[in-house]
Amino acid sequence: MEKFAFVLHPLSLEDMQMVSPFVRYVPDFLLEYILKNKKPFTVSHITGVKSPYAEAEGWFVGCPLTAKQMVELPEEFVIDRIVETGKIAEELGAKILGLGAFTSIVGDAGITIADRLNIAVTSGNSYTVATALEGTREATRLMGKDLREAEVAIVGASGSIGSACARILSREVRHINLIARRIGPLEELAQELNGQGAATFSVSSDIKSGLHKADVVIAVTSAVDFIIDPADLKSGAVVCDVARPRNVSRNVSRNVSALRNDVLVIEGGVIHVPGDVDFRFDFGFPPKTCFACMAETMILALEGRYENFTLGRNLLPSQIDTISGLAEKHGFSLAGFRNFEHAITREMIEKIKHNANLSR
Protein backbone atom coordinates (compact mmCIF):
# COMPACT_ATOMS: atom_id res chain seq x y z
CA MET A 1 0.00 0.00 0.00
CA GLU A 2 1.46 3.34 -1.09
CA LYS A 3 0.99 6.34 1.20
CA PHE A 4 0.64 10.09 0.60
CA ALA A 5 -0.59 13.25 2.31
CA PHE A 6 -1.85 16.59 1.07
CA VAL A 7 -1.91 19.96 2.84
CA LEU A 8 -5.21 21.84 3.00
CA HIS A 9 -5.75 25.33 4.36
CA PRO A 10 -8.70 27.75 4.51
CA LEU A 11 -8.54 30.15 1.58
CA SER A 12 -10.47 32.82 3.46
CA LEU A 13 -12.34 33.48 6.68
CA GLU A 14 -15.53 32.92 4.69
CA ASP A 15 -14.43 29.31 4.17
CA MET A 16 -14.33 28.82 7.92
CA GLN A 17 -17.70 30.52 8.36
CA MET A 18 -19.30 28.18 5.81
CA VAL A 19 -17.99 25.11 7.64
CA SER A 20 -19.31 26.07 11.06
CA PRO A 21 -22.35 28.23 11.87
CA PHE A 22 -20.74 29.11 15.21
CA VAL A 23 -17.75 30.70 13.48
CA ARG A 24 -20.04 33.21 11.77
CA TYR A 25 -20.48 34.96 15.11
CA VAL A 26 -16.74 35.28 15.78
CA PRO A 27 -15.30 38.70 14.80
CA ASP A 28 -12.79 38.52 11.94
CA PHE A 29 -9.86 39.82 14.01
CA LEU A 30 -10.48 37.18 16.68
CA LEU A 31 -10.86 34.40 14.12
CA GLU A 32 -7.56 35.41 12.49
CA TYR A 33 -5.89 35.33 15.93
CA ILE A 34 -7.29 31.85 16.62
CA LEU A 35 -6.13 30.51 13.24
CA LYS A 36 -2.68 32.04 13.64
CA ASN A 37 -2.21 30.25 16.95
CA LYS A 38 -3.94 26.97 16.12
CA LYS A 39 -1.64 24.00 15.54
CA PRO A 40 -1.79 21.91 12.34
CA PHE A 41 -3.96 18.79 12.50
CA THR A 42 -5.12 15.70 10.62
CA VAL A 43 -8.26 16.48 8.59
CA SER A 44 -9.23 13.07 7.20
CA HIS A 45 -8.05 9.62 6.12
CA ILE A 46 -8.29 8.97 2.36
CA THR A 47 -8.92 5.43 1.12
CA GLY A 48 -9.74 3.64 -2.12
CA VAL A 49 -7.24 5.22 -4.53
CA LYS A 50 -6.58 2.28 -6.83
CA SER A 51 -5.17 1.87 -10.33
CA PRO A 52 -4.49 -1.34 -12.28
CA TYR A 53 -0.92 -1.17 -10.97
CA ALA A 54 -1.09 -0.06 -7.33
CA GLU A 55 -3.26 1.07 -4.43
CA ALA A 56 -2.76 4.03 -2.11
CA GLU A 57 -4.13 5.57 1.04
CA GLY A 58 -3.49 9.05 2.29
CA TRP A 59 -4.41 11.90 4.58
CA PHE A 60 -5.52 15.47 4.32
CA VAL A 61 -3.48 17.45 6.85
CA GLY A 62 -4.60 20.94 7.80
CA CYS A 63 -2.55 24.11 8.07
CA PRO A 64 -4.93 26.61 9.72
CA LEU A 65 -3.62 29.81 8.07
CA THR A 66 -5.73 31.58 5.44
CA ALA A 67 -4.34 32.74 2.09
CA LYS A 68 -4.28 36.31 3.36
CA GLN A 69 -2.32 35.29 6.45
CA MET A 70 0.19 33.35 4.35
CA VAL A 71 0.84 36.48 2.32
CA GLU A 72 0.92 38.98 5.19
CA LEU A 73 2.51 37.10 8.11
CA PRO A 74 6.32 36.79 8.30
CA GLU A 75 7.52 34.26 5.75
CA GLU A 76 9.55 32.31 8.32
CA PHE A 77 6.48 31.91 10.55
CA VAL A 78 4.37 30.63 7.65
CA ILE A 79 7.03 28.17 6.47
CA ASP A 80 7.46 26.89 10.05
CA ARG A 81 3.72 26.25 10.24
CA ILE A 82 3.68 24.39 6.90
CA VAL A 83 6.66 22.29 8.01
CA GLU A 84 4.78 21.45 11.23
CA THR A 85 1.92 20.26 9.04
CA GLY A 86 4.34 18.15 7.01
CA LYS A 87 5.69 16.56 10.19
CA ILE A 88 2.18 15.30 10.94
CA ALA A 89 2.17 13.66 7.50
CA GLU A 90 5.50 12.01 8.33
CA GLU A 91 4.12 10.66 11.61
CA LEU A 92 1.09 9.24 9.78
CA GLY A 93 3.39 7.28 7.48
CA ALA A 94 3.04 9.31 4.28
CA LYS A 95 5.98 9.06 1.89
CA ILE A 96 5.10 12.10 -0.23
CA LEU A 97 3.42 15.40 0.66
CA GLY A 98 1.43 17.59 -1.72
CA LEU A 99 1.31 21.32 -1.06
CA GLY A 100 -2.16 22.75 -1.59
CA ALA A 101 -3.14 26.28 -2.62
CA PHE A 102 -0.95 28.99 -1.05
CA THR A 103 1.31 26.51 0.78
CA SER A 104 2.93 25.83 -2.61
CA ILE A 105 3.91 29.45 -3.32
CA VAL A 106 5.21 30.72 0.02
CA GLY A 107 8.90 31.61 -0.01
CA ASP A 108 10.81 29.61 -2.61
CA ALA A 109 7.76 27.56 -3.66
CA GLY A 110 8.36 24.45 -1.60
CA ILE A 111 12.15 24.04 -1.78
CA THR A 112 12.83 25.07 1.83
CA ILE A 113 9.85 23.05 3.05
CA ALA A 114 11.17 19.94 1.27
CA ASP A 115 14.65 20.48 2.73
CA ARG A 116 13.18 20.47 6.24
CA LEU A 117 11.08 17.32 5.82
CA ASN A 118 12.11 13.67 5.61
CA ILE A 119 9.56 12.79 2.92
CA ALA A 120 9.19 13.82 -0.71
CA VAL A 121 7.29 17.02 -1.55
CA THR A 122 5.48 18.25 -4.65
CA SER A 123 3.37 21.31 -5.41
CA GLY A 124 1.21 19.52 -7.96
CA ASN A 125 1.77 22.30 -10.47
CA SER A 126 2.92 20.02 -13.30
CA TYR A 127 -0.38 18.17 -13.52
CA THR A 128 -2.25 21.41 -12.85
CA VAL A 129 -0.75 22.88 -16.03
CA ALA A 130 -1.34 19.71 -18.04
CA THR A 131 -5.02 19.48 -17.18
CA ALA A 132 -5.65 23.23 -17.38
CA LEU A 133 -4.38 23.25 -20.95
CA GLU A 134 -6.28 20.06 -21.79
CA GLY A 135 -9.49 21.60 -20.47
CA THR A 136 -8.86 24.91 -22.23
CA ARG A 137 -8.30 23.18 -25.57
CA GLU A 138 -11.53 21.20 -25.25
CA ALA A 139 -13.60 24.17 -24.02
CA THR A 140 -12.29 26.32 -26.87
CA ARG A 141 -13.28 23.63 -29.37
CA LEU A 142 -16.78 23.33 -27.92
CA MET A 143 -17.20 27.10 -28.19
CA GLY A 144 -16.49 26.81 -31.91
CA LYS A 145 -13.10 28.50 -31.81
CA ASP A 146 -9.87 27.50 -33.51
CA LEU A 147 -7.16 27.67 -30.85
CA ARG A 148 -4.51 28.05 -33.55
CA GLU A 149 -6.06 31.39 -34.53
CA ALA A 150 -6.88 32.52 -31.01
CA GLU A 151 -5.53 35.45 -29.06
CA VAL A 152 -4.64 34.16 -25.60
CA ALA A 153 -4.12 36.16 -22.41
CA ILE A 154 -2.24 34.59 -19.50
CA VAL A 155 -2.87 36.45 -16.25
CA GLY A 156 0.02 35.72 -13.92
CA ALA A 157 2.36 34.82 -16.77
CA SER A 158 5.52 35.50 -14.75
CA GLY A 159 4.73 32.74 -12.24
CA SER A 160 5.70 29.08 -12.58
CA ILE A 161 2.31 27.89 -13.85
CA GLY A 162 1.73 30.90 -16.09
CA SER A 163 5.16 30.76 -17.73
CA ALA A 164 4.82 27.01 -18.29
CA CYS A 165 1.46 27.57 -19.99
CA ALA A 166 3.08 30.24 -22.17
CA ARG A 167 5.92 27.91 -23.18
CA ILE A 168 3.55 25.16 -24.25
CA LEU A 169 0.95 27.39 -25.93
CA SER A 170 3.61 29.33 -27.85
CA ARG A 171 3.66 26.40 -30.29
CA GLU A 172 -0.14 26.23 -30.60
CA VAL A 173 -1.66 29.72 -30.84
CA ARG A 174 -1.36 32.92 -32.87
CA HIS A 175 -0.74 35.53 -30.16
CA ILE A 176 -0.18 35.52 -26.40
CA ASN A 177 -0.58 38.56 -24.16
CA LEU A 178 1.54 38.03 -21.05
CA ILE A 179 0.01 39.85 -18.06
CA ALA A 180 1.40 40.39 -14.56
CA ARG A 181 2.10 43.21 -12.15
CA ARG A 182 5.77 43.61 -13.13
CA ILE A 183 6.71 44.15 -16.76
CA GLY A 184 10.39 43.13 -16.47
CA PRO A 185 9.91 39.37 -16.02
CA LEU A 186 7.28 39.38 -18.77
CA GLU A 187 9.65 41.00 -21.24
CA GLU A 188 12.31 38.41 -20.39
CA LEU A 189 9.82 35.58 -20.96
CA ALA A 190 8.60 37.06 -24.24
CA GLN A 191 12.18 37.44 -25.45
CA GLU A 192 12.96 33.83 -24.49
CA LEU A 193 9.94 32.42 -26.32
CA ASN A 194 9.92 34.70 -29.35
CA GLY A 195 10.62 32.62 -32.44
CA GLN A 196 10.29 29.24 -30.70
CA GLY A 197 6.80 28.73 -32.10
CA ALA A 198 4.12 30.39 -34.17
CA ALA A 199 2.98 32.80 -31.46
CA THR A 200 3.79 36.48 -31.23
CA PHE A 201 3.87 38.14 -27.81
CA SER A 202 2.81 41.31 -26.05
CA VAL A 203 3.19 42.23 -22.37
CA SER A 204 0.98 44.22 -20.03
CA SER A 205 0.63 45.14 -16.38
CA ASP A 206 -2.93 46.41 -16.93
CA ILE A 207 -5.29 43.47 -16.58
CA LYS A 208 -8.41 45.26 -17.82
CA SER A 209 -6.92 46.43 -21.10
CA GLY A 210 -5.05 43.17 -21.51
CA LEU A 211 -8.22 41.08 -21.56
CA HIS A 212 -10.52 42.99 -23.93
CA LYS A 213 -9.25 41.26 -27.11
CA ALA A 214 -8.59 37.82 -25.63
CA ASP A 215 -10.45 34.83 -27.06
CA VAL A 216 -8.95 32.62 -24.35
CA VAL A 217 -7.90 33.67 -20.84
CA ILE A 218 -5.84 31.52 -18.49
CA ALA A 219 -5.87 32.99 -14.98
CA VAL A 220 -3.10 31.67 -12.75
CA THR A 221 -2.03 34.42 -10.37
CA SER A 222 -1.72 34.07 -6.60
CA ALA A 223 -3.77 37.20 -5.91
CA VAL A 224 -5.72 36.94 -2.67
CA ASP A 225 -8.72 38.81 -4.08
CA PHE A 226 -10.62 38.55 -7.34
CA ILE A 227 -8.88 40.45 -10.13
CA ILE A 228 -11.08 39.73 -13.16
CA ASP A 229 -14.53 41.27 -13.48
CA PRO A 230 -17.28 40.64 -16.05
CA ALA A 231 -16.70 43.88 -17.95
CA ASP A 232 -13.07 42.89 -18.61
CA LEU A 233 -13.98 39.98 -20.87
CA LYS A 234 -14.66 39.71 -24.59
CA SER A 235 -17.97 38.18 -25.68
CA GLY A 236 -17.48 34.48 -26.34
CA ALA A 237 -14.28 34.29 -24.31
CA VAL A 238 -13.18 31.03 -22.73
CA VAL A 239 -11.69 31.56 -19.27
CA CYS A 240 -9.78 28.84 -17.44
CA ASP A 241 -9.41 29.84 -13.79
CA VAL A 242 -6.57 27.75 -12.38
CA ALA A 243 -5.71 29.83 -9.32
CA ARG A 244 -6.90 29.42 -5.76
CA PRO A 245 -8.38 31.70 -4.52
CA ARG A 246 -10.23 32.12 -7.78
CA ASN A 247 -9.23 35.02 -10.01
CA VAL A 248 -12.60 35.26 -11.72
CA SER A 249 -15.39 37.24 -10.10
CA ARG A 250 -18.33 35.07 -9.07
CA ASN A 251 -20.44 37.44 -11.19
CA VAL A 252 -18.88 35.96 -14.33
CA SER A 253 -19.79 32.36 -13.73
CA ARG A 254 -22.91 32.53 -11.58
CA ASN A 255 -25.46 30.27 -13.26
CA VAL A 256 -27.34 31.99 -16.10
CA SER A 257 -25.71 35.25 -15.12
CA ALA A 258 -27.58 38.28 -16.38
CA LEU A 259 -24.30 40.17 -16.46
CA ARG A 260 -22.27 37.90 -18.75
CA ASN A 261 -24.12 34.89 -20.08
CA ASP A 262 -21.86 34.98 -23.15
CA VAL A 263 -18.61 33.94 -21.43
CA LEU A 264 -17.53 30.38 -20.53
CA VAL A 265 -15.61 30.10 -17.28
CA ILE A 266 -14.15 26.75 -16.27
CA GLU A 267 -12.11 25.66 -13.27
CA GLY A 268 -8.73 24.29 -14.19
CA GLY A 269 -7.76 20.81 -13.19
CA VAL A 270 -10.85 18.93 -11.93
CA ILE A 271 -9.79 15.29 -12.05
CA HIS A 272 -11.45 11.86 -11.88
CA VAL A 273 -9.59 9.59 -9.42
CA PRO A 274 -9.40 5.85 -10.23
CA GLY A 275 -10.78 3.31 -7.78
CA ASP A 276 -13.43 3.90 -5.16
CA VAL A 277 -11.83 6.86 -3.43
CA ASP A 278 -13.35 8.26 -0.24
CA PHE A 279 -11.82 11.56 0.88
CA ARG A 280 -13.97 11.80 4.02
CA PHE A 281 -13.91 15.56 3.56
CA ASP A 282 -16.16 17.72 1.40
CA PHE A 283 -14.19 20.31 -0.59
CA GLY A 284 -17.06 21.03 -2.98
CA PHE A 285 -16.39 18.48 -5.74
CA PRO A 286 -18.48 15.46 -6.79
CA PRO A 287 -17.45 12.07 -5.37
CA LYS A 288 -14.26 10.53 -6.79
CA THR A 289 -12.95 13.84 -8.16
CA CYS A 290 -10.31 16.24 -6.91
CA PHE A 291 -8.01 19.11 -7.86
CA ALA A 292 -5.12 18.35 -10.22
CA CYS A 293 -2.56 19.25 -7.55
CA MET A 294 -4.05 16.60 -5.27
CA ALA A 295 -4.07 14.13 -8.15
CA GLU A 296 -0.37 14.68 -8.87
CA THR A 297 0.45 13.65 -5.31
CA MET A 298 -1.63 10.48 -5.66
CA ILE A 299 -0.14 9.66 -9.07
CA LEU A 300 3.41 9.87 -7.75
CA ALA A 301 2.46 7.69 -4.77
CA LEU A 302 0.85 5.04 -6.98
CA GLU A 303 3.96 5.03 -9.15
CA GLY A 304 6.14 4.69 -6.03
CA ARG A 305 7.98 7.76 -7.23
CA TYR A 306 8.82 9.26 -3.86
CA GLU A 307 10.91 12.21 -4.98
CA ASN A 308 10.64 15.99 -4.92
CA PHE A 309 8.84 16.32 -8.24
CA THR A 310 7.45 19.84 -8.79
CA LEU A 311 9.16 22.47 -6.65
CA GLY A 312 10.40 26.01 -7.17
CA ARG A 313 9.32 28.49 -9.80
CA ASN A 314 10.83 26.91 -12.92
CA LEU A 315 8.36 24.41 -14.29
CA LEU A 316 9.70 22.33 -17.17
CA PRO A 317 7.60 21.02 -20.09
CA SER A 318 9.34 17.65 -19.59
CA GLN A 319 7.85 17.42 -16.07
CA ILE A 320 4.41 18.13 -17.49
CA ASP A 321 4.84 15.43 -20.12
CA THR A 322 6.04 12.93 -17.50
CA ILE A 323 3.15 13.45 -15.09
CA SER A 324 0.64 13.39 -17.96
CA GLY A 325 1.95 9.98 -19.02
CA LEU A 326 1.81 8.63 -15.47
CA ALA A 327 -1.72 9.99 -15.02
CA GLU A 328 -2.88 8.16 -18.14
CA LYS A 329 -1.14 4.97 -16.98
CA HIS A 330 -2.92 4.98 -13.62
CA GLY A 331 -6.35 6.03 -14.93
CA PHE A 332 -6.60 9.69 -13.91
CA SER A 333 -8.56 11.87 -16.33
CA LEU A 334 -10.23 15.25 -16.73
CA ALA A 335 -13.67 15.07 -15.08
CA GLY A 336 -15.62 17.38 -17.39
CA PHE A 337 -16.05 21.09 -16.76
CA ARG A 338 -17.04 22.85 -13.56
CA ASN A 339 -17.20 26.36 -12.18
CA PHE A 340 -17.87 27.44 -8.62
CA GLU A 341 -18.70 23.87 -7.58
CA HIS A 342 -21.29 23.38 -10.34
CA ALA A 343 -21.08 21.13 -13.40
CA ILE A 344 -21.10 22.74 -16.84
CA THR A 345 -23.12 20.67 -19.31
CA ARG A 346 -22.83 20.62 -23.10
CA GLU A 347 -26.24 22.29 -23.21
CA MET A 348 -24.98 25.16 -21.05
CA ILE A 349 -21.96 25.61 -23.31
CA GLU A 350 -24.21 25.70 -26.39
CA LYS A 351 -26.34 28.37 -24.73
CA ILE A 352 -23.28 30.49 -23.91
CA LYS A 353 -22.06 30.03 -27.48
CA HIS A 354 -25.48 31.12 -28.80
CA ASN A 355 -25.52 34.21 -26.57
CA ALA A 356 -22.03 35.15 -27.75
CA ASN A 357 -23.10 34.86 -31.39
CA LEU A 358 -26.11 37.10 -30.73
CA SER A 359 -23.93 39.82 -29.22
CA ARG A 360 -21.66 40.10 -32.27
Protein language model annotation of sequence segments:
Residues 129, 159-165, 225-227:
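Short glycine/serine/threonine-rich phosphate/pyrophosphate-binding segments
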